[in-house]
Amino acid sequence: MMKSENDGYDYDGKIRDIDIADEMKNGFLDYAMSVIVSRAIPDVRDGLKPVHRRIIYAMWDLKMTYEKQHKKSARIVGEVIGKYHPHGDTAVYEAMVRMAQDFSYRYPLIDGHGNFGSMDGDPPAAMRYTEAKMSKIAGEIIKDIEKETTIFIDNYDGSEEEPTFLPGYFPNLLVNGASGIAVGMATNIPPHNLNEVIDGVIAVTKNPEITTVELMKIIKGPDFPTG
């Protein structure tokens, strides 16, 4: 079987010499970018990591919007791992639980029904017992997704399509914040008040040259869910 150049072989099967420093650099960068893009760091356009985006998109596809009834969390997790996120169900459910906790998210993206844990560290009930649907504000993140507002790519096995980002009618990255540790990169953004952020966006739109000091008069500081 022919080997590619990245395998350290020529196409005729002969071993070729490579510079170990270059190979380490290229390999590390490829791995780092894979972790950054595919797992650990949120996209600035919608403020979501892939697992969170896939949860919201799967719920939207299942018609589990705010005005509809709650459905079993296990149904959602199965949809996510079966179509978009080929990883363990535990990781998906943990992300989903956090999205429903009003002490973890300033503006929860999931409306949970049942035991979703507590501030004191009590664990949530198993996914077969809890139910969920999209929160009202989550509908604003995915609103108009069917109107060519995003770019779709094939899922992991090419059987479905998924969005690379959600349209986002508000800056979720600033509103709900984000944290993540990747390879060679990390982020930790606190949440902010929605009204203040929108006022700040309007101010920047009206005056692109606005200073940080002027903007801080509008957005005075973080707004954590626990006060």
Swiss-Prot record:
InterPro entries for this protein: Topo_IIA-like_dom_sf, Topo_IIA_A/C_ab, Topo_IIA_dom_A, Type_II_DNA_Topoisomerases
Reactions it catalyzes: ATP-dependent breakage, passage and rejoining of double-stranded DNA
Topo IIA-type catalytic domain mapped to chain residues: 41-227
Gene3D superfamilies reported for this sequence: Topoisomerase II, domain 5
GO cellular component: cytoplasm; DNA topoisomerase type II (double strand cut, ATP-hydrolyzing) complex
Residues forming the catalytic site: 129 (o-(5'-phospho-dna)-tyrosine intermediate)
PROSITE patterns tied to this protein: TOPO_IIA
Miscellaneous remark of the record: Few gyrases are as efficient as E.coli at forming negative supercoils. Not all organisms have 2 type II topoisomerases; in organisms with a single type II topoisomerase this enzyme also has to decatenate newly replicated chromosomes.
SMART domains in the cross-refs: TOP4c
E.C. designation(s): 5.6.2.2
Protein name as it appears in the record: DNA gyrase subunit A
Species the sequence originates in: Spiroplasma citri
Subunit text: Heterotetramer, composed of two GyrA and two GyrB chains. In the heterotetramer, GyrA contains the active site tyrosine that forms a transient covalent intermediate with DNA, while GyrB binds cofactors and catalyzes ATP hydrolysis.
SUPFAM superfamilies: Type II DNA topoisomerase
Main location: cytoplasm
Superkingdom of the organism of origin: Bacteria
Gene Ontology MF terms: ATP binding; DNA binding; DNA negative supercoiling activity
Places the protein is found: Cytoplasm
Tagged with keyword Oxidoreductase: no
Family of this protein: Belongs to the type II topoisomerase GyrA/ParC subunit family.
